[in-house]
Amino acid sequence: MILVVAAIIKKQNKYLIAKRSSHKEHGGRWEFPGGKIEEGETPEIALERELFEELNIKTRIGSFIMSATHDYERFRIKLMAYEATQLSGEFTLSEHDEIAWVTAAQMKSYHMSKADLSIIDYLMKN
């Protein structure tokens, strides 16, 4: 199982989502930004690192929100979502084609990563 973290960054009742680069696995799908936890990392440290590497932003990782397990065709992931706050940095995309700020309801019209769907359901209820 692959352990993955995702950031739930909220500003003015909208959430940050990012579109995976077309050359990556599941390219073209939208997702909450984040990535894989490397050996020896806590989920929070991994998330701070991924957000800096992929979006060029410094963040403060907040509360754990939820986790979800998803089976893809060739692998299984456990996705852990955390609240995150952008502290500094201008968005520079290295792993994504674009970003968007959307409401939880608007996410339903985006081609979201399947692993993120349970997080969207949670956000819509809370």
Say what each PLM segment does.
Residues 1-16, 36:
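Conserved N-terminal beta-strand and adjoining loop/helix that marks the start
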Residues 83, 92-123:
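NUDIX/MutT-family hydrolases
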